[in-house]
From Swiss-Prot:
GO cellular component, one term: extracellular space
Keywords from the named record: Secreted, Signal
Location within or outside the cell: Secreted
Pfam families, sorted: DUF1942
Name of the molecule in the record: Immunogenic protein MPT63
Superkingdom of the organism of origin: Bacteria
Gene field: mpt63
Lineage: Bacteria, Bacillati, Actinomycetota, Actinomycetes, Mycobacteriales
Signal peptide range in chain numbering: 1-29
Entries under InterPro entries matching the protein: Immunoprotect_excell_Ig-like, MPT63-like
Protein species of origin: Mycobacterium tuberculosis (strain ATCC 25618 / H37Rv)
Matching SUPFAM superfamilies: Antigen MPT63/MPB63 (immunoprotective extracellular protein)
Amino acid sequence: MKLTTMIKTAVAVVAMAAIATFAAPVALAAYPITGKLGSELTMTDTVGQVVLGWKVSDLKSSTAVIPGYPVAGQVWEATATVNAIRGSVTPAVSQFNARTADGINYRVLWQAAGPDTISGATIPQGEQSTGKIYFDVTGPSPTIVAMNNGMEDLLIWEP
């Protein structure tokens, strides 16, 4: 093997390692990302290719009727907007919880469908989708909305 070929190969290996080192923090955000209700919180998917923003606002008790769902407590709602910043985004509506200050969670009624609910349909880059998310609150009133992937909180909106 020629010396110039070996040098080119070594430079390429070092360059690839540097790119991987500097690009990794983009995909490995420190969760949870927190903000105020009404603010857009931005996250990146696990491989760093899709960037999306979620905005959750106006958490309150609701007079909405959820067809086909037997409510055990009081229906609460929030307005959610998902923004496909880079890449197409399929909204993970099922990951939302309304939460009390002392940690009681109320899962989103992700199966609730209606003209004002946020769609779980994929949206293309540069587009956004807005709608209501609903919760069946069976205890103390929530003040926080959290997005949790089943292992950890990703995004948290507080008053």
